[in-house]
């Protein structure tokens, strides 16, 4: 049984996806007069992918990010949620989530891969059975496209929010390469890369990453990335996207050779600079240092199922409805 698939386009872009977690674990961007550059974090073996606790490249669900209070509430109903010990919330679907499952191959060609998963009623604590499909495709011109589809079965509504948790390192340190610096070898720090966001608001968060208020303007503050600038700080932050035709995010390498434009149909973006990557990849090959890459996670705002008043589309799926969203990653290499 194949556990890894490779997709290529006519321009030389190449990606790899694993059955485990429907995980996007490699992306090689063609450059002029140079070998293609690996821009994703990944591991040398499948055992490391299974061992890591950083969701590296994985498809996350049923709910990406956090749900507060260890239960899901709607009206008079409540459903206890699975969670890691010691947390006051469920994170990324909890233990044994979609990121830790072997997905079923539905379709594979040179330019496209489609994987499926059945999530039964009560899975992770969520009501209703959910049939999920994730499609990776390379339509050309440096684009990696991820399409999510989920259909809910049963008598109860359920919030659905899937994302991909790839970590980007556009300077090509994605396979254990190191750069020489004072005092010996060091890893490239993603905080010196340039980021621009199409986000005029951000969600205040507490120390657990849960909402500490309503979305607020970023204008002139530390979270104002509407103009391109160095990341410059640790981030594990939810931004409200402005929408429209402009990218949700633009990331650029330090050497200026690679840029990424991210487009999404989802209403928010979690930006995480990987400041817990070292403990989360302990025992993996390689073990990634903190701040060695950034995750750009299109999704709903944290704890959205309990906040229908927020300025975004409804995250609750009714029985028989289909949840469909698209992330589009356009790489520019030169």
Where are these regions (language model features)?
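An exposed, glycine/acidic-rich loop-and-rim segment of catalytic or binding clefts
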Residues: 1-334
């Amino acid at each position: 049984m194949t556990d890894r698939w490779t997709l290529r386009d006519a321009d030389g872009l190449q990606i790899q996806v694993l059955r485990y977690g429907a995980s996007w674990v490699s992306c090689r961007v063609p450059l002029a007069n140079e070998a293609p550059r690996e821009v994703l974090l990944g591991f040398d073996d499948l055992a490391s992918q299974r061992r890591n606790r950083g969701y590296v490249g994985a498809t996350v669900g049923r709910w990406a990010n956090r749900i507060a209070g260890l239960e899901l509430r709607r009206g008079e109903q409540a459903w206890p949620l699975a969670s890691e010990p010691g947390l006051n919330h469920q994170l990324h679907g909890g233990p044994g989530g979609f990121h830790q499952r072997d997905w079923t191959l539905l379709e594979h060609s040179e330019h496209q891969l489609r994987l499926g998963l059945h999530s039964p009623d009560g899975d992770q604590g969520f009501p209703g059975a959910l049939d999920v499909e994730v499609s990776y495709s390379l339509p050309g011109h440096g684009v990696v496209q991820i399409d999510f589809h989920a259909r809910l079965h049963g008598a109860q509504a359920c919030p659905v929010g899937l994302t991909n948790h790839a970590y980007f390192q556009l300077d090509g340190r994605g396979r254990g390469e190191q750069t020489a610096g004072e005092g010996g070898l060091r890893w490239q720090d993603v905080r010196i890369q340039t980021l621009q966001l199409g986000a005029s608001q951000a969600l205040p968060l507490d120390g657990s990453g849960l909402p500490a208020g309503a979305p607020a303007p970023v204008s002139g503050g530390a979270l104002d990335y509407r103009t391109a600038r160095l990341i410059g700080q640790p981030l594990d932050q939810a931004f409200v996207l402005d929408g429209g035709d402009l990218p949700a995010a633009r990331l650029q390498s330090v050497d200026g050779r690679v840029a990424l434009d991210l487009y999404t149909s989802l209403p928010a973006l979690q930006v995480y600079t990987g400041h817990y990557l070292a403990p989360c990849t302990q025992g993996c090959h390689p073990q990634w240092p903190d701040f060695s890459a950034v995750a750009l996670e299109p999704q709903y705002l944290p704890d959205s199922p309990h906040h229908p008043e927020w300025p975004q589309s409804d995250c609750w799926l009714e029985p028989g409805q289909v949840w469909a969203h698209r992330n589009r990653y356009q790489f520019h290499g030169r």
